[in-house]
Every structure is written in C-alpha cells, then in structure tokens.
Amino acid sequence: MKKKLFFTVTNDLVYDQRMIRICSSLSAAGYDVTLVGRRNSNAPPLGTQPFRQYRLRTWFRSGKGFYIEYNLRLFFLLLTQKMSALCAIDLDTILPCYLVSRIRRIPRLYDAHELFCEMQEVVSRPGIYRIWKAVERFCVPKFPNGYTVNDLIADEFFRLYGVRYAVIRNAPVLRPDPAADIARLPIAAPPLPAGRFILYQGAVNEGRCFESLIPAMQAVDAPLLICGEGNFMEPARALVRQYGLENKVIFRGMVRPEDLPPITRSAYIGITLFDRQGTSNYYSLANRFFDYIHAGIPQLAVNYPAYQEINNSYRIAVLVDKPGIREISDALNRLLNNTELYHTLLANCKQARLYYNWQEEEKKLVRIYQQLFCPQFFN
C-alpha cells in the first residue's frame, strides 16, 4: 500500500511552483500525495496535477484572524485524514501539523522555505515577531526531520535549535530546449513589451527593493514587466504614478506557472533584489534566481552570500552590494549596453542550469522520504 503524505501551505496552490514540483516528484516516486492550501476569493480553478489538492475556505483573508482561523480549520481537517507522514511548509502551518502528528503518532517534517521570523514583514513588527518566534522556539526542535533551500538557512536552524536539515534548492526542471518556451505563450495572453524588456517575477512584497527599482527605471532605456502580486502592490503602483512611469513599468498580475516560462525566456534581463533588513532576505535563495538561469537570461541580483557563491562559480549575474536607485540603474544599463558581458553571462547560464536543476534536487528529496520510512536501509 502506498504511503500517504500530506503537505500544508497557507497560500493558494495554483501558483506555488516549489510545492507543485515537490508533490509531483514524490507522487512519481510512488507516494500518495495531498497538498492542502487556502482558497482565495478570486482564485482560478486548480490545474490537473498527479497528486490530490485541497483548498480551505476562510472568512478572514489576512492578519491574525486569518492565521488563527486557517490553523484551526487545518487542524480539524488533518485530524480526520488517514496519512503516513505530515510535512509543514513554513512556520505558519507548523502548529496543527505538530499536534496532529503527535495525536496520530506519525512522522512529521518541516520544509523551511525561509527564516520565517526574519522576514521583513515579520521582524519589522515587534508584536507579530514575538508570537511567531514563540511558535518557532516551541515547534522547530520537535521536527528533527526537514529540509530547506540553502546551506545558510540549514546552518542557522542547527545553530538555533540543533536540528540538521537537508538542502533542496528551488531549481526548475531541466528542459532540453528552453528557447522552445517562447512558442508556447498562451494565445489569449496580453502581448509582451516590444523589444528588450526587464522582468521581475515573483511576490510583489515588502523587502523586494521596489522603492529603488521603480525610480531607477527613469534612467534605464527599457521597460520593466512585473509578474506577480503581493502586499506591496498598492505602494508599487503609487511609485509608478509618482515618477510618471505608467508607460514604462507594466504590472501583469499573477501568471500561472505553466504560462510563466515563455515570458521569462522572452525577457532580456531578470531581477532578483532584496532589502538587507531581516536575516531571511540576506540568507535568501529565490526561485526566480534559478528561473532566470534556466531561461538563459542574465540578471541583476543582490550580492548576498547564496547568490555570491553561485555567481563565483558560474558568473551568471551582475551583483550589487547596495540595491539603491543609482546602483540599480547603473547595473541595468551595463547589462543593456555591454554586449560582450551580456553574452558571456548568457553562455554561463547554459552551463549553470546543467548543475542546478530539479532532476538533481529531487534525488535528494526522494531519499529523505525513503529514509523516513525505511531507515534500516540507510544506516
């Protein structure tokens, strides 16, 4: 009989590329997988996946009310399900997973996409920070099994709580011909900007340097396309209006994962920027960093440890120490105007993608679950 795995998130399932990859790989490895998330009021229909998907409805949409309601609903849902193991994705679903795993006496795992308590939107709010830090201190030591996105975060969890987590990077599936993605743009999709354009894809949240990126576009001779939404959408739109960039900065909104690769491949430059506030940003290794590599486009990224380590090995990006307005515009213009540099970085992307890809990462992922259920074969 197949082992039944449950994974829990607080976001809508349609756009979660990492969880789609993880659940698909474990399903292909022979597990019976269910992914549980939230249902937003304007959520599109779920796509067909090789695993089960379940979306919880909530009255509250954000804030403390949402997290309390969602965790209660999640607890009672999980309590009624048959499962062999349970994996909490980030800190905001860890409590119900811990309680249900104790009640049901089943293995539990923690998938830490980031240092949750050190995110800018948490660390900048002392009351919220204290609540989540208490949850982290109580729960994480009780999750001896888990994985995260890079060695820096894994080392931090070991330093704080004595748990040694594996590293599963957010790299895309290696495709034989990424250029073919361009031909797969949906017929009904809005047209892309004409000529060379700069792309930001991902959450439009606090701490992503939009306060500097948007005004920097005044001095850059190319449009900026933003694919995504988040808690900084209204301030970002206000910045565009403030600087008169309505014809230069384009908001595309949310894009389904299957529709995103052709857009990424059509871009000329990618953007991976984070503010320094919060250790989570400093230790980050964003999905889009690898998405740009696989699309074969050079990018502008912050000179933080995880990005620096990869760039030192493959030189696929221009890194900035300080993501200020002048630094961003200078770096973007360098990529736009220095053809030799651009094509060197582009060629290096093609080499880097052969090493950083999901086919390599999923081997480690599957091994984690094999060890969980059959430890005698790995001792």
Predicted features along the sequence, with ranges:
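Membrane-proximal helix-turn-helix segments that form the acceptor-binding/catalytic region
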Residues: 24, 72-79, 95, 99-103, ...
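A charged, aromatic-enriched C-terminal amphipathic alpha-helix characteristic of glycosyltransferases
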Residues: 340-373
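Acidic donor-binding loop of glycosyltransferase active sites
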Residues: 264-282, 297
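Conserved acidic donor-binding segment of nucleotide-sugar-dependent glycosyltransferases
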Residues: 313-325, 333-340
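Nucleotide-activated donor-binding/catalytic signature segment of Leloir-type glycosyltransferases, i.e.
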Residues: 227, 234-262, 269
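Nucleotide-sugar donor phosphate/pyrophosphate-binding loop at the beta->alpha transition
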Residues: 65-69, 107, 117-139, 206-207
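Donor nucleotide-sugar binding/catalytic pocket of nucleotide-sugar-dependent glycosyltransferases
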Residues: 37, 54-55, 133-188, 193, ...
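Conserved donor-binding/catalytic core segment of Leloir-type glycosyltransferases
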Residues: 5-8, 147, 191-221, 225, ...
